[in-house]
Amino acid sequence: MINRQYFIWYIFIFNIINKIYFENIRYVKNYEVVIRKKKNIERGIGNDFAFIRRYYKSRLLSDVSYKNNSIKGKNRVDKEGDIKKYDNNDDNKMDNSYDYKNKSIKENETKIRKEQVISLDKRYNRNINEKEEIKKKIKDIQRKRLIIYFKQDNTILSSRNYKHIFMKVLSSCGHIEKLTFINFYLYEFPKSINNEDMLLKICLRLLESRRINVENDNQISHTVQMKSYNNNNNKWDNINSKNNCIYQIKDKIKDLPNVSPSASTFTSISTSPYTLKLRDRNKYANDKNHIFKINHSNKHKNNNNNNNNNDYHNNNKSNYHSHSSAKCQTQRLNKKMIGTNILDGYDIIQMEEGLNLSHNYELNDVNVCIIDTGIDENHIDLKDNIIEKKTFMKHSYKKYNIDGINNIESDNIDGINNIESDNIDGINNIESDNIDGINNIESDNIDGINNIESDNIDGINNIKSSDNIKSSDNIKSSDNINSSDNIKSSDNNNVHTMLRNKLYLKKKKECSNYNTSNDGHGHGTFIAGIIAGNSPKGKKGIKGISKKAKLIICKALNNNNAGYISDILECFNFCAKKKARIINASFASTTHYPSLFQALKELQDKDILVISSSGNCSSNSKCKQAFQECNLNIQKLYPAAYSADLNNIISVSNIIQQSNGNIVLSPDSCYSPNYVHLAAPGGNIISTFPNNKYAISSGTSFSASVITGLASLVLSINSNLTSQQVIELFKKSIVQTKSLENKVKWGGFINVYDLVRFTIDSLPKDKDE
């Protein structure tokens, strides 16, 4: 009964697949026959020789019968109609003719047999090559994710039923995860595959169908690298170092340094596109000349006319300090350390006036999804605004690397709690935090272990059994340690493991405060503070742009600030599922991924606004996470470049203010009049950091975060606006500048006061009154 059901299912599936999906693929319908023939070939060439012998034997018998019939006809009619008998000479001639013919048949038989052998060899080799090709295909896609989506058409092939049947057959060979809200499928083959399975070969044929798009999963990352200042060695350290530990992040905002643009206090912007500036804040704490006052004028046209270059600038020039190395600089209010810099007084986009105007109109909650490195969900300034949190890290490996110790998992620190007393006397119990009993390890033949420090265990990878180990406390000195005193190689491995794990425990203890949160990098937490920081500490905490923003956090990037396209697609699906109105996507790649474009198109159909950073660039070739080319017209970056074909993407560059008051593009910001819409402040912003810390940083990611917060602000005032209407309000509120005219599509930067005013005007009359 089971075989019959399987047979019926098999015929049904094959007919549908062959007739509907695989008109371009040969041999699928008769695949079973092809397999059977191949198996016959593999059994040996003898079977085919037997077939040849039978064939030519029948030919020979037919020839013999022809001869006999000819001999029987002794009489024949000549041309004149006379009857004449054949004599013996005629018989001899016929025999000779038959012998010649028989010899010719044998020669032809030998020739054909040789040709058949060659043909069989070719068929056999072709079969072997096909097997090797299938194995190679399987090896290439095994343990990898494939991104699948159906090509859009209006035929019956796009119906749910046929898609369901298609994916059901594929599911028999591997695991399928359906992303319902963006119409994608993530496909993975199992770790162990039977290469001889006919169904597997059919699945490979399925993946070659012209009805679907199949894309390999690829890695994508941010374009920035965070740094912190280390007071111990007076140099800049990468935050995402080998030990993934973050140092010199302040507990309180008042402990953060004031950033003054002088060559002696911080590095040029173009040197590091994404740098945390941690300096002594007391240097300018009492210097009132460093306080930049807000220009409250809304008449930008008058300001433009006062400038010979027709460029927008602030009139108060005396409050700036020139940056001697770059001839341009960012400014930071040095006295009030509240919130982001656009709230503190460095207010070139009139954020403070706009927020004051919007205060009584923000009535609607807005779901904002952040696809990034995660968030510190316990941060006091953020925890009340987080409504959803999800991690998609299918490719991440939980390893903890410390200077050559590569195989210690962060979730498993067992193995150093107990060392058997039979192997090493006097070292019965070793606690994880305290190793008593091995105070001094001396050796005559072990390099690098005279002094063992917790921060350096290089050089003790191998401890040989022939080495003599003397201990001043628990292992007595002797020339040869015999029996129970003898330390074997396995015991030495235990000692090595013990020392290695002790160092790991110390490093883990140092970093434990930073590993408790879901954001081990800090980038996602920093962005969340700009958008929706809502500190209960008042001026001592971070106040973000949109108080009504409800954060949906999706972690698609690991602690090294990198992730995979499939993880990002899962986050897109998660954001759509949770009904997000806005998605902040601060990542970029030089590679065009059709699946990423298709997913953004699905979000466009769902009226979801996507805010993307333009990307950071640097002329420094050593900066691996910054692009060498700043002009996106020359080197496209995605997803920013998709804005030319999609109308739900806003791409943002970073602006700074020169000492003369002019607003210009930051030298480390990517730009394009075709793919980047506008610019926003993103330099020296103070925001939240994991474990209730605060930090200062710069980059286009934070410019995009400012626009994300403003989009949330607009929707909190008028939730009935569509994404296109929000974009039109942004375009209407742009301050045109000559310096940005050929840098961004809209030719300027946003004015928040005008944006809020236009949004309030868009409200229905009854609500406005």
Curated annotation (Swiss-Prot):
What residues bear carbohydrate chains?
Answer: N68, N102, N108, N295, N316, N356, N482, N515, N584, N616, N720
Q: Does the keyword Cytoplasm apply?
A: no
Question: Biased-composition ranges for Basic residues?
Answer: 293-302
Low complexity compositional bias, start-end: 303-325
Enzyme Commission identifier(s): 3.4.21.62
Q: What SUPFAM superfamilies does the annotation carry? A: Subtilisin-like
Q: Which InterPro entries match?
A: Peptidase_S8/S53_dom, Peptidase_S8/S53_dom_sf, Peptidase_S8/S53_subtilisin, Peptidase_S8_Asp-AS, Peptidase_S8_His-AS, Peptidase_S8_subtilisin-rel
Q: Annotated region Disordered: where?
A: 293-329, 468-493
Family, per the entry?
Belongs to the peptidase S8 family.
Name the UniProt record assigns to this protein: Subtilisin-like protease 3
Question: What is the source species?
Answer: Plasmodium falciparum (isolate 3D7)
